[in-house]
Amino acid sequence: MFANPVVKSFQYGNHTVTLETGVIARQATAAVMASMDDTSVFVSVVAKKEAVPGQDFFPLTVNYQERTYAAGKIPGGFFKREGRPSEAETLTARLIDRPIRPLFPDAFKNEVQVIATVVSINPEVNPDMITMIGTSAALAIAGIPFNGPIGAARVGHINGELVLNPSNTELENSKLDLVVSGTEGAVLMVESEADNLTEEEMLSAVVFGHDQQQVVIKAINEFAAEVATPAWDWVAPEENTVLNSRIAELAEAKLVEAYQITEKMTRYDRIHEIAAEVNEVLVSENEDVNLKEVHTIFHDLEKTVVRRSIIAGNPRIDGREKDMVRALDVRTGVLPRTHGSSLFTRGETQALVTATLGTQRDAQIIDSLMGEKKDHFLLHYNFPPYCVGETGFVGSPKRREIGHGKLAKRGIQAVMPSIEEFPYTVRVVSEITESNGSSSMASVCGTSLALMDAGVPIKASVAGIAMGLVKEGDDFVVLSDILGDEDHLGDMDFKVAGTNEGITALQMDIKIEGITKEIMQIALNQAQGARKHILKVMDEAISGAREDISEFAPRIHTMKISSDKIKDVIGKGGAVIRALCEETGTTIEIEDDGTIKIAATEGAAAKEAIRRIEEITAEVEVGKIYTGKVMRIVDFGAFVTVLGPKEGLVHISQIAEERIEKVADHLQVGQEVKTKVLEIDRQGRIRLSIKEANAELNPAPAAEAKDAE
């Protein structure tokens, strides 16, 4: 039935990788089952034979989905099926997209969809690497125009050694989690989180990962040769040299002048005017001119003008030299009622960042295929349309916002205190209020400032910087603190976050081949100088965490009780702890070892909660007098509280000196009385006496008279 299944297995570090095609999803353009040990991902590629006429962009979609059956689980929730992509799934989809997108020809506009589905998982083997390898293999056998294949490698830094594709357990002890992807001759993408590693250590890890993945690229080439899919007969459309020349004649000189306007919105207005003038002239010359084609050529001309100017050594778009950082403005404590806040402005990029402290109950529970964990540090990045002077949809975060938030979080994670050192859940929100390049790195700077303003004892200030590159032949220029236009028109986006001591996050996206180790070294060194300049300005505003947290933040008080007393504090069905929280206005969390954390914005409330917990957990002593309330009345006596919720029985004979017939004649429910503990039996039942307590507290007049004689 299955005519020619092709299977390719090879060793990759400590793992066995298997690629298989020809059995599943045979109607797709290409489909590969990729496995790394017991982690298996099924990747399909479907490409349309024809592009939409006049389409001026490349419609590539990458979908990554984790099925819970892969881990032998049933989804939680009401519907019991997978829903919208999780944050982790979105980040993995971006990880796949970034290195493959630049490998399609610029003129290729046919729709391509990649769908990767995790179908089996070993908790020790993260599925992202094998997904990237499987995607590369599927594209390599699809027959479509693709300048791959790519490889992918995860690199750890454990005990001073670089480790290829460490397991999830090994990563817990690693100072580095770096993913690098590239072709045989070039690195295309780097994504990493580090614990203050040096520039040299980071570069060594990138080179190591790229060298190691050559075995993957070789295996995929052999796999593709065996499958031998016929290549599409796609040919790039011929360049319209006549239209190119005419647009250059009409607009080039004007664009050179326009790109000397340093203010972004004024420059954009002028460029739009030039574009409108060009359209008007071309339509008057030929009514049938394709304006979409004109737009594409005009944009390419813009790119040529800017790149030529930078390579020639001229000042940049906003007038800066290549290694200059834009003007900085740093403010903290800008919002009165938030727990911590900052406003970080770098040129025309601005981030308003807030930090909020919560209890451990506020931690995010992440239920992934590899197990459940709690995240006590949350960082959310918002990019509203007004920050670039536009209108647009406002709603759920898009892929880009999720990716930028994760990058900023990676930059800060290394300096965050442990939950034992600072028992709070911390949520940071970065609102990008202006944007002209490098907003994710502005978020890193703003987050560092807001955390210090909130009194979070981070280990050091962290700053981030975005670098760019323009390369023509052997000539190249590395740019510090790139603008949005320089990012768009350049060959590399290189973001580095770190402290004065080292790098905490590195993200790199390269659009061309030929980026050498030397170029990356220059970029890293130039980024170090820019980062230290920004840190100096930040430290002038605030150089360490405030000594005290905000008066509006919850204060967490910790106490310890015996673990066998936990049930007393919780009560039947949680009744006792619920009442404690409601009546004292606090939030109380109890751990299995008896550690209790009480969160309250007012000190008096916390003290009252502590007093009541101490009362509940205290041991009742025989012979001691306690004040309690009558809880129930029965024929043979009354049940009275002793310590907190503990109750004891006052027998009818122990209520008063004289004989009584009805308990209700002397006691009412809710009445406060003093009782003396007579006995605690083996079962923990407490016997109380009101009459002995009264006798001890109020000696009889006769006895007093006798004493007086």
Curated annotation (Swiss-Prot):
Domain (S1 motif) spans 623-691
Tell me which residues bind Mg(2+): D487, D493
- GO molecular-function terms, A-Z: 3'-5'-RNA exonuclease activity; magnesium ion binding; polyribonucleotide nucleotidyltransferase activity; RNA binding
Q: Please tell me where this protein is predominantly located.
A: cytoplasm
Its Gene Ontology cellular component terms are: cytosol
Required co-factor(s) are: Mg(2+)
Query: What's one Pfam family the UniProt record gives for this protein?
Result: KH_1
Which branch of life, at top level? Bacteria
EC identifiers of the protein = 2.7.7.8
Catalytically driven reaction(s) = RNA(n+1) + phosphate = RNA(n) + a ribonucleoside 5'-diphosphate
Q: Which UniProt keywords apply?
A: Cytoplasm, Magnesium, Metal-binding, Nucleotidyltransferase, RNA-binding, Transferase
- Localization terms from the record: Cytoplasm
A GO BP entry is:
RNA processing
SMART domains to which the protein is assigned, alphabetical: KH, S1
Q: Sorted alphabetically, which CDD domains does this protein's record hold?
A: KH-I_PNPase, RNase_PH_PNPase_1, RNase_PH_PNPase_2, S1_PNPase
* Broadest EC class assigned to this enzyme: transferase
Domain called KH: residue spans: 554-613
NCBIfam families (alphabetical): polynuc_phos (TIGR03591), PRK11824.1 (NF008805)
Q: What does this protein do?
A: Involved in mRNA degradation. Catalyzes the phosphorolysis of single-stranded polyribonucleotides processively in the 3'- to 5'-direction.
Assembly information from the UniProt record: Component of the RNA degradosome, which is a multiprotein complex involved in RNA processing and mRNA degradation.
What family is it from? Answer: Belongs to the polyribonucleotide nucleotidyltransferase family.
Q: What is this protein called?
A: Polyribonucleotide nucleotidyltransferase
User: Which organism does this record belong to?
Assistant: Aliivibrio fischeri (strain MJ11) (Vibrio fischeri)
